[in-house]
Amino acid sequence: MKNVVALILAGGQGTRLGVLTEKIAKPAVQFGGKYRLIDFTMSNCVNSGIYKIGVLTQYKPHLLNRHIGIGKPWDLDRKDGGVTILQPYSTEKVGVWYKGTADAVYSNIEFVDSYSPDYVVILSGDHIYSMDYNELVDYHVAKSALGTVACMEVPLSEANRFGIMVTDLENRIIEFQEKPKFPKSTLASLGIYVFQWNFIREVLMEDAKDENSTHDFGKDIIPKIINTKRVYAFPFEGYWKDVGTIYSYWESNLELTRPIPPFNIHDENWKIYTHSEEMPPAYISDDARVKNSLISEGCEIYGEVYNSVLAQGVEVGEGVIIKNSVVMSRVRIGNNCFIENAIIAENVVIGNEVKIGVGEFVENKLNSRVYNSEISVIGMDSVIEDKVKIGKNCVVGIDKIVSKSLTSGEYI
């Protein structure tokens, strides 16, 4: 790999994930049974031979910091390079929060300078995909580009959620719209950039002085630098998913249970590394039934699990039926429960004879923009007491004790 430093933007709150990110940053949310979202970007880096990595954290970083540690699971505990957690710090002139994605990189110029790189790759820490960044950098070099933006085609109905590009026949970006109401194309930025470091360094320093800038790559930096006529789009044709909503998070997890999933977490040639607890193998009893599901280490299954993803250390009692659900680590489920179309966050305790996901769909009373499907969400460290019924599209916040039933659309 050429002399490259990677910066992973991992400070996002992920407000559209609701209670799932009340205690932790979005990149720290569990995914696929044993992983956290940031694992996919971190693994892409080391699989691409990039071992000089800065992780820029901000919102509730403690679990994320502990998860990454010194980077040992990714072979990043090394003298030359490795991974460095870069949190906002206060000086006499600068506040303690990054003002935007560009300001986050600007605030860590000294870190990048310490490696004297030719190129910097800037990545998001909360997307699901596999990409060889060598191909991205090689494309960038071949084009003699100052900047390159990875992109893919998206449905027109979703284009207003992305930065949208218009390109010429050589893939040169000639226009960039950030989340436009009326998109001029369906070519969307994936939030994956490579820049010549000396070039983007100067751009960021100029942007920092601009009082009218929001200091954001999509809103300010990319639209500004396309005037150089040396900023290109890199077409990406693999699987890429922004699991930024409750539904997309649930759907992307359950896609992994298909016989041939659209995203392969079992690829021996492109492994996904993570920091995980040492747990014994999963135990599935004689009376249990498991079909089309991912069952992680340390699980004990005495009931029935269908089309679901269970993270490490989940206990499923006798007479339990779980369907189309995502259950995060160390959840304990009592006996004779029914759970369907649910996301249950870490360390939740569910009593006996509990039902979750029953009844008819009703619009959510807490936030119908965030919670807008039949999926019910149970926040971290909550307790659902015996015989409680929870309807569809319900929300239980973090650290709650639920002793009374909730009809569809209700919250606590």
UniProtKB/Swiss-Prot annotation:
Q: Which InterPro entries match?
A: ADP-Glc_PPase (IPR011831), ADP_Glu_pyroP_CS (IPR005836), GlgC_bac (IPR023049), GlmU/GlgC-like_hexapep (IPR056818), NTP_transferase_dom (IPR005835), Nucleotide-diphossugar_trans (IPR029044), Trimer_LpxA-like_sf (IPR011004)
Q: Which gene encodes it?
A: glgC
Spell out the protein name for this chain: Glucose-1-phosphate adenylyltransferase
Q: What is the lineage of its organism?
A: Bacteria, Thermotogati, Thermotogota, Thermotogae, Thermotogales
Q: What class of enzyme is it?
A: transferase
The biological process GO terms on file are: glycogen biosynthetic process
Reactions catalysed, semicolon-separated, are: alpha-D-glucose 1-phosphate + ATP + H(+) = ADP-alpha-D-glucose + diphosphate
User: What SUPFAM superfamilies does the record point to?
Assistant: Nucleotide-diphospho-sugar transferases, Trimeric LpxA-like enzymes
Q: What is its EC number?
A: 2.7.7.27
Which keywords fit this entry according to its UniProt record? ATP-binding, Carbohydrate metabolism, Glycogen biosynthesis, Glycogen metabolism, Nucleotide-binding, Nucleotidyltransferase, Transferase
Superkingdom of the source species: Bacteria
What's this chain's function? Answer: Involved in the biosynthesis of ADP-glucose, a building block required for the elongation reactions to produce glycogen. Catalyzes the reaction between ATP and alpha-D-glucose 1-phosphate (G1P) to produce pyrophosphate and ADP-Glc.
Q: Which GO terms describe its molecular function?
A: ATP binding; glucose-1-phosphate adenylyltransferase activity
Subunit structure, per the record?
Homotetramer.
